[in-house]
Amino acid sequence: MRKLIMYIGLPNSGKSTHAETFAKEHNYVIVKTNEELLRELDKEESRVIFDSYNNVRSNRIKLIELLKDKFEDLFISGFYMATDLDTILKREAKKEDANEDFVFEVIKKTSVPHMNEGFDNLELIGFDRFKTREIYFDKPLSYQDYVKKVLSYPIINKTIELPHDNHDNVFSVSRHMFYAYQNISKLTDNKQLIAAAMLHDVGKGITKRTSDNVYADATFDGHVNVSAQLAVLYLLNCGISKEEIFKIVFYIQNHILIKEYENNPNKKNELEKLLGSEIQNLKLLEIVNQSVK
């Protein structure tokens, strides 16, 4: 059997260091380009690590489909590097050729992987994975408790009473998430969905951009991907399983695709394959999201 480990991580995330250590311990060959990857996988019983950002979901899906068509005995694992975003940006700032704008653009484009992309296995590589936070998904919280107990995490706390400054949203970011959490708790006892509602916009705190034009709406480009990445970091400290973390983050990252799934016939089959059996849950989360403005 051929084995491939695809690392998914940001610049300065420590993925190359982790890959080198893993390769030595488990006898893998590290490659960094598609050409090298295909050449190594041509060898029977090959064990290959693909050390690249691999951050864009559509590119991952295309590559996995290509590789599985070519190598029937290929087992593909995804190793997602969950590294604190503050740490990543601080490491970049220390470089002589620092380009923080580039790194932030990569952050906004990076999607957390999911099994539906074609992976046979997924691993979360988190450097502080131990229970340091309580889980509040099954406990009714007041807004004050929600802010204190959930949104106090670094970077996530930037959403507290952050105004949306646009024509679509009346509530602040933190209140929007809180009301979504309250409403979905009345409709389901699915703890992963409730957790997703609690955290679904936490990336808006660092993606908000305003214009010199006082009449222009603020923008939050990339906030869905950033919210998913921050949710992983938060959930790693809740002591729950990787399967639960990936499911919660899947809801956060994909509920906005429901409109496209319902309204774009050309995308329906593609999205059905990606969203799988979670379509109804994603619909519920998006309904709640749209109901609280």
What is each stretch, according to the model?
Residues R2-I8, S13, T87-S142:
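Conserved GTP-binding G-domain of TRAFAC-class P-loop NTPases and closely related GTPase folds
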Residues E72-R91:
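Conserved phosphate-donor/acceptor-positioning beta-strand/loop module used by diverse small-molecule
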Residues L10-N59:
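Conserved substrate/cofactor phosphate-moiety recognition/catalytic segment
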Residues T132-S211, Y215-A216:
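Acidic/His-rich, divalent-metal-binding segments that scaffold phosphate/diphosphate chemistry
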